[in-house]
Amino acid sequence: MKKLYLFALLLTFVSCGTKPAEKQIADQFMAFSDESDSFEPIKAAVKDKRIVILGEAGHADGRTFEIKSELIEYLNTDNEYDVVLEGMGFLDAAVLQGVLPPLCIDSNYLDVANAWNALWSQTKETSSLVNAMHSGKVRYWGMDCQPSLSDYFLIPYLMASSPCVSSVLAGNTFDSLMAIHDRIIGMDTTLTHNELDYFDAKMNQIRKALEDETDMEKKAILDMAIDNALAFSGQVRLGFTEWDAQNEGINIRDRQMAENVEWYLNRYPDRNVIIWTANFHGAKQISQINYGKEPDPDLYNKYVLLGEHLEKAFPGQVYSLAFTSGGGSEGYFYANDSTAIVPDSISMEFQLSHRGMEYGFCDLSQRKDWTDLVFYSTILGYDCKPGKWAQTFDGIFYIKENHKAHEINR
């Protein structure tokens, strides 16, 4: 694989004369001194797309969070979009949006700032978006199958939501299922396959019992909540320590996130969505990027991620926008330190940093001549990799100076 990429890079270099592909790409970016000036060109690029994916190079990019929040509010001026969030569970959103009643879910914790993962919701940089969602100005939904607020109430919620479920959870079954589920949420590595089999079987029995539920919307949402619980159970079954298991777990999660989005769009056919996630999950063909590291240089060939699933389900209706930076720093809001962002000298970001622009946008989807162009970029976690990026993302947003996320006191 490495030899093939080197050959492709050589062909790219020859076809571009003496100008490296990275500089060729960088020279085509529209430059902006203020980030808001880029929003109208982005709006034009995503026009008529039902799904807009907004990524981030890392989950600690404060300036990226800020710009994504501003961009969402700009694109949603006339309520054209709902926001679908990585880091928020499927059931959380159904309850928070009033589609299902809270029942046994503690109302003291029932808030978007608690239900959305703290990596984003507890930062100053997303505060305007969180406030807009909290006030009802922006509609939202959760797409994650990772443990979130409602998961801690899932078993009692299922029991309280429908009389059909009571018979499945009679006797000691409720306590046994609760105990196993708590350990699943805690990613307990001592869980046995028998215990996980028991959990999966009972969840499927609950699903079967819900066939008698007469409220079709409730039934549909609870059915998806069970799907999400089983998806995470599948990740726990694989484990989080072995290399192959971790990577198969990524595929399980991305497939379920895509199914959650697909369910939402099919359920509400008049709605469009903006998805908040990482560049990695937004990749439409991650296999076109060369991972190139041991122990598995061809790792990306094994992934089918959120963006790719959605492109297959909604062909031509997905625009995936990656965010990247040419300098500054990144850091989690809860950490005192930060890490400098220093683009590799062979990367597109290095070339962009020498153009001197504060912000930049490039609509890759309009450059069909770049489809097979191989160039180096740090789009995925600020790690410099070669690949056919125009097959992986539809657009790139460049930030000259990023900064760490900052905690907000609510």
Language model features with spans:
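Bacterial Sec-dependent N-terminal signal peptides
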Residues: 1-24
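Structured catalytic-domain cores with a bias toward divalent-metal coordination
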Residues: 16-410
